Amino acid sequence: LKDIMGRLGFTVAHGPEIEDERHNFEALNIPKAHPARDPLENFYLATAQKLQGNSAGPMLLRSQTSTVQIRVMENQPPPVRIISLGRVYRPDDADDTHFPMFHQIEGLLIDKHVTMADLKSVLRLFAMSYFGGDVHIRFRPSFFPFTEPSVEVDMQWHDRWIEMGGAGMVDPNVLRAVGYDPDE
C-alpha cells in the first residue's frame, strides 16, 4: 500500500490516536450539533482531559484518520501529498463488518489546479495496482462535512459491489480552518 502510493508521489504521515475536538471535529467542518459528535458515537476520555490540564477541552480516541490531515496542513504549506494509515475507534457493536477499533487509510492532495478528475484517477490507479488491472470501481455521490463534492467509492467483487470508502475534494471551510486560502 505504502509502495503503491509512494510511486504516485505520496508520503506517509502519522498522528496521535488521542485527539481534541478541534482536530477530530471542528477543523473538519463537523459542527457541534452534528450526530458524529454525539458522546454515544465516540470514546471520550476523562483521564486524558485531566492530564492535559483543567483548561483542556474534551479528549477522545480519534474516530477517523482525517485528524492527521489537519495536523499536516497546520504545519506544512501547500503542496501536500500524504497518506495516513492507522487505528480509529467508534463504539460500534461487533459483527461481521463492524468493530470498535478498525483501520483506515486516507490520502490528501493539496495543490493548485487539482480537480475531481485527478482524485478519481489516483483512486483508479491505486485500485488497479493493488487489486489488479481488471478491477472495476464506481463513484456514487455522497456527503461528508469535510469534502465538497463527496463520493462513495465501490469496487466490483464477483457479482456485487463492495464499499471501499469515501472521497472528495477538501471543503473550503477545512482549508480555512488550517490557514489555507481556498481560492488558490
Q: How does the language model describe each region?
A:
Residues L1-E184:
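TRNA-recognition modules of translation machinery and tRNA-sensing kinases, especially anticodon-binding
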